[in-house]
Amino acid sequence: MSKKEKYIFSVVIPVYNAEKYLSETVDSVIAQDIGFEKHIQIILVDDGSKDRSEELCLKYREKYPDNIVYISKENGGVSSARNQGIPYIEGRYVNFLDSDDKWESDVFSKVYRFFEKTYDRIDLAACRMRFFEARTDYHPLDFRFKNRNDRIINILNEENCIQMHVTSCFIKAEAVRKWTFNEEQNYGEDTVYISRIIMDRGRYGVVTKAVCNYRKRGNDSSAVQGMRGKKKWYIETPDQFYGELIRFSMERYGTVIRYLQQLLVYDLQYRVGFGYNHVLNKEEFETYRQTVHKYLSYVDNSCIIRSKTLTMDDKIRMLSFKEGSLNREQLSLRDNIVMYQDSALVNLADRGATLMVNFLSVENDTLILEGCIRTWILSCWPELQLKYVVDEQKYYPAVFNDYDIEKKETLTGDEWQLRFYRVRIPLSGKQQQIYPMIELGNGEECRMKMVFTKFMPLNALNPGAVCFRGKYFIRYAANAIDVRIPSNAMKTKIAYEIKAFNYLRKNERMDAAKLRIQAVCRRFFKKKQIWLISDRDYVANDNGEHLFRYICEHRKEYPDVEPYFVISGESPDYERM
């Protein structure tokens, strides 16, 4: 390290009314196995907090006076706070950590080893982002880390490997000092900052086993709505975000490189997928709509098609918005693959999110399947017919309902995400294999992959997930529903209960296995039906709550029902419910 580099790492933490989480964040840095007091500096920048944040900051500074710098300033936003901390940096590598996120304890040592091997080749290294609290999975861009080895990504060769967040990055201090955060920008300011660093160098590193825990709060949706309730998000942010990066790419490369096009696709999907907001008048909204279209026009269609994060609904919507309407003449189906302008959109035989089966029942020796199909495929082929095939010989057409569900307001207009269908299939008593197929207007056929929703007793992964409907035994096998009347129903039930138990045990789900055993035992005793009712796991106050309250208030009408409302213990509605 040079004389200016007193530490290996400097961590800049902007603080604003963060008393609830700040200790977790700071403690995660102090706990680093590389050694905090010798190798790490923390710069706490209080951006005019009105809670106990300053008190906490001062306590940490008092405890670690050689490692912690405390700066107090008037409220000016997160970019202002980050910029204020930059002159105090004394580390070789810098992390801008949000005041409610935290690092795993071995991250800094892993990042240090990686940087020391690649110092002359990169300016920035990114780590994995794992959500916690209201959501517990990894960031949609986590596919970049599927390779187990740390590596350097050349952005001209791996256009899909975009980096959006600064909090999960470590940046060389000399690169940090070359740039500043735009203090007038309230959304995407960190993406602009790191994108200039990445595009300037043309590559960046990924440390595959270093994990940043990114807090996803249950009220994040309300924060997003708050952002969308401000005119600035519509009128100023697009130019500050997309316009700035396009200008930078043109100056650096003479073109809008495909890496940046993928970044535009990733962020613009949320704007194209979000329709009219009454914060704008009609004229302002039309201007905003044209602005979004202008920036989407910098994106080649193939970037939309090849995106690894867009759903098919997103791809069709963005292509339609960009071109004015979907050019159906450029759509084709080749070996179950949907093609658009000779680029592959999706393999219908592999992808499971197009056709869903929601309910299964048997009435009068007739199997009734009810489900839904995603409407993007109907927008591609309005004349499409859905049918279920039995034993490769007989076809039974599905009947679509007159109504769709999941209405979504978008820049292309109102969309209905799903269309319901029902199909009735006569049962013979002999073994029958049943699977769905679509037929296009030109006679082309494609076998569809089924997805069973939460109300279905079948499961594609668990071989023990089967059901009886009267005398009929029903299971899932080889992307088909298998129906038959077993010669010994009890023997069949026991065999598949054992399979279900072994599957759960193999996958270390003994908690679920025990519940399964209890459920089997309870069948031999008279009991009430247990109804589990819910809205979302973190929020109540919707149709589920109203149904639950109705049943509770009319218990005499439901004497054999024991209702329970399911909700997270961390939900703000938990105590009320």
Put a short name on every predicted segment:
Residues 1-244, 264, 513:
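Nucleotide-sugar donor-binding/catalytic module of glycosyltransferases
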Residues 76, 246, 552-556:
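Surface-exposed amphipathic alpha-helices with a cationic face
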Residues 137-142, 392-399, 573:
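Surface-exposed loop/edge segments in extracytoplasmic proteins
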Residues 214-218, 224-254, 270, 276-301:
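Catalytic core of nucleotide-sugar-dependent glycosyltransferases
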Residues 243, 255-278, 372-373, 434:
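P-loop NTPase catalytic cores that bind/hydrolyze ATP
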Residues 278-281, 286-530, 553:
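Basic, ligand-binding patches in group-transfer machinery
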Residues 369, 406-411, 435-437, 520-521, ...:
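Active-site and donor-binding regions of nucleotide-sugar-utilizing enzymes
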